[in-house]
Amino acid sequence: MKQQDMTVLAEFAYTIPALSHGYAGQTLYVDVGRGQISGRPVTEDMKERFIGGRGFDLWLLWHGVNDNTRWDSPENEIVISSGPCGGTSQYPGSGKSIAATISPLTDVVIDSNAGGHFGPYLKFAGWDAIELQGQSERDVIVTIDASAGEGGEGYVKIIDAPADCPVDTHVLGRWINDTFAETEPDRELMAFVSTGSGSNATRMGCLNFSLYDRKRRDLRYKQAGRGGIGTVFRHKRIRAVIVRTTRFGADTNGPADPTRIAQTGADMRREVTRWDPVQNRMRSRGTSYLVQIMDDYDLLPVRNFQFGAHPDTPLINGDVWEQRFTQN
């Protein structure tokens, strides 16, 4: 089915703002149950006290839920933010998104982070965070289209997921590319969040954050794996949240001191390039290197933080990952 033939359940138009000092100055609220979409201002007090990222997530979640909210309550929210440094292309790791919700595993607030391009693209689209609330009666897709660029008109829509829309991310990603991206550059400037059918059967569901790999000309995914946020996402009957932005550069984030940002970023890159191969080895092992280090220092959260180490750690540490799953 073509995008223009899909049933739009709710629509919200807005003017795409310029970013200033890492902020768009507004957050996006979407209630998939009631079909409500609105923008909410980011106050100076929010910036001063909570900065962004996890801070904004917790602030917005606090005001969205109540004392009786459980993970499967309609008023439970999933909040995603990248923070003021998100999308600063000079900095390694600035593609991170942080998501928060009330966990189906613990019934308390948790947060989880992931790479990919969704967080920065969300901000480039004019939003410092997104709140997803409510529970839909049908599977829906949330789209954020800011392809008109700064000063243009953007659109947020809740769309009825058509019958040919897959659930599982590895298939859904191809469908989204074919349906919402007309050209290769369109695919590079689009990112989405989804989960899979497995989240229907577990409270440990992950969120998948996409990025388009220009060299491979294909999608890759990063996971927010803590706390079962994907289970909450699927319970709300959201298939995907898609964001489209426009071309961006080193100054898109509106830094107060671009020269200092560039110099600091260059210093960080040199340090990572020099020391990562002999210290963390993140390039070859990813976050699996943390398993051994945390076990050595009695910090590994074994059995829900009852213990800090486990005798079987050598079976799943970075050495095993590098031997079994990489091409090094």
Model-inferred region functions:
Residues M1-N113, H117-N328:
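Intrinsically disordered, low-complexity segments enriched in small residues
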